[in-house]
Amino acid sequence: MSTESMIRDVELAEEALPRKTAGPQGSRRRWFLRLFSFLLVAGATTLFCLLHFGVIGPQREEFPKDPSLISPLAQAVRSSSRTPSDKPVAHVVANPQAEGQLQWLNRRANALLANGVEPTDNQLVVPSEGLYLIYSQVLFKGQGCPSNHVLLTHTISRIAVSYQTKVNLLSAIKSPCQRETPEGAEAKPWYEPIYLGGVFQLEKGDRLSAEINLPDYLDFAESGQVYFGIIAL
């Protein structure tokens, strides 16, 4: 039964009341009928809104687990997410046995060379033109502060094929010592990490290097503290 039919029935019932109910008792009856009509309309309206906005009604269907029921587009998205990338990438780590220098190694745990990146003369050679994320981190460690001011530098440089000149892409300087350790005072250890990272347009054949000025302060106590890498975007 529709809402209009229910309202019409109530109106007919009200019209069918004997005319003698015009007194106080008849007024109460008409008032109750009007109240009942209002509640009926309000309830029907509420039910319609709940059904319309999906608050009540049939539950949503779960995503089918059977591959045959999955749309071709969804299958294509899933398969593409599993396709290995063919973009150049490199991640090299420092050689802890190289004294007095920062030497990069690619044949170590957690190191990686893929899709054309080659190490040459402690540098990474870019295999193809494009945008690259270049990054590097070093960790310095010392004991106490000497009389001469300690300045720690870390630099990522580029030698482009178009102009054979070394150009700094990223650079940072830190000083672990604000003042000299007084004579006789305890020489406390200090640590200074430097991280560099940025996105650059590179050409095929460009050579990239990550260097420091004081390799004797490098800390190799833990793996993953000193590294250098590039990722094609």
From Swiss-Prot:
Glycosylation sites: 80
Transmembrane annotation, as ranges: 35-57
Disulfide-linked positions: 145-177
PROSITE patterns linked to this entry: THD_1, THD_2
GO molecular function: cytokine activity; tumor necrosis factor receptor binding
Signal sequence, renumbered to the chain: none
Extracellular side: 58-233
Keyword list, A-Z: Cell membrane, Cytokine, Disulfide bond, Glycoprotein, Lipoprotein, Membrane, Myristate, Phosphoprotein, Secreted, Signal-anchor, Transmembrane, Transmembrane helix
InterPro entries found in the cross-reference section: TNF (IPR006053), TNF_alpha (IPR002959), TNF_CS (IPR021184), TNF_dom (IPR006052), Tumour_necrosis_fac-like_dom (IPR008983)
Cytoplasmic membrane side: 1-34
Keyword GTP-binding among UniProt keywords: no
Occurrences of domain THD (ranges): 88-233
Post-translational modification: The soluble form derives from the membrane form by proteolytic processing. The membrane-bound form is further proteolytically processed by SPPL2A or SPPL2B through regulated intramembrane proteolysis producing TNF intracellular domains (ICD1 and ICD2) released in the cytosol and TNF C-domain 1 and C-domain 2 secreted into the extracellular space. The membrane form, but not the soluble form, is phosphorylated on serine residues. Dephosphorylation of the membrane form occurs by binding to soluble TNFRSF1A/TNFR1.
Lipidation positions, renumbered (N6-myristoyl lysine): 20
Subunit structure: Homotrimer. Interacts with SPPL2B.
Protein name: Tumor necrosis factor
Organism: Papio anubis (Olive baboon)
